[in-house]
Amino acid sequence: MRFLKWAIIFILFNSAFVESKEGYADNDGVEIFYVDYGPIDNEPILLVQGLGGQLTFWPDELISVLQDNGFRPIVYDNRDVGLSKNFEEYGRPNFVWNYAKFYLGLPLTSVYSLADMASDGIAVINHLNIEQTHLLAQSMGGMITQRMVADNKDRFKSYVLIASMARTPDLKTAPKGELRKLIEDRSFKNQSVDERVERSIEIFKILATPQTEFDEAAFREEVIKNINRSDNESGFSRQLIAILADKDRYNEVQGITTPTLVIHGKLDPLIPYEEGKKTAELIPNSTFLSVDFMSHLIDKPVMDFIEKPLVEFLEENS
């Protein structure tokens, strides 16, 4: 009887855990893996990850903040990453040729488009029978969702765009120096697990907010766990080509009527701050939140800073 009593208390105090579920949404034969954290009675918010990012990359603190304030986070693996359908049968793109075309300003051909990836997110909310949801996206996820929102205005109550831009990367906006080399290495090379872990550490150090406390041992463990979850290393390359093959989305974002909060860090080495600010200026009904100390990631110092304005924005548009 005492065990039953404590079991009931555990369930009551962990209702979000009990209500979470996972599964696959079908998008015309492309299976998209999702996790619905619940609770199901809360306001849904769809989160869309960046380049090569599995759904496990979302900070636990962000998920907790959303749940604690009455929201229902729903995350998913973009196509060609994590447990969603991979496109490994197409092989790794020829990056010598593709980078040459990119630097010459010539059009690129991708296996799938950002518009295709946007339709994956719509498939997830359709599968869950959600008519309207809030939307939060980071980096490449922001590029995907610009098309998602522009083409499906009636499906979104609000839109949070973090560390992204409406411009297609070019020579002016492409990453420079060591970050560019690390991205090229991931695009070109088949590397060992140890090499991939070391590369991930170097990328994190560049993209993380300077104030972030870095536990290297825990980070290594997390990287290995994600590699074990999905070893589709070439998906990063195909997603990158989809970004470079896309057109500027200036016209699309100017047509967005959904209330929008754009968040961008002044220290971002991947997506220039000026491009984030310009994107906010192009979206008619938007608010721009500048974070002086932020690099590219939503790490703890950034989460602590944006929590209040983020929650207030979502609540105002619920």
Predicted segments with their positions:
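Conserved alpha/beta-hydrolase "acid-adjacent" motif
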Residues: P269-E275
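Conserved acidic catalytic loop of the alpha/beta-hydrolase fold
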Residues: Y103, P107-V111, A115-T133
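Alpha/beta-hydrolase
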Residues: A174-N251, K278
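Short beta-strand/loop motif that positions the catalytic acidic residue
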Residues: I256, V262-H264, D268
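Conserved HGGG/HGGXW glycine-rich cap/lid loop of the alpha/beta-hydrolase fold
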Residues: V30-A100
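Conserved hydrolase catalytic core segment
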Residues: E131-L171
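Catalytic active-site module of serine/aspartate enzymes centered on a nucleophile-bearing elbow/loop
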Residues: S286-S318
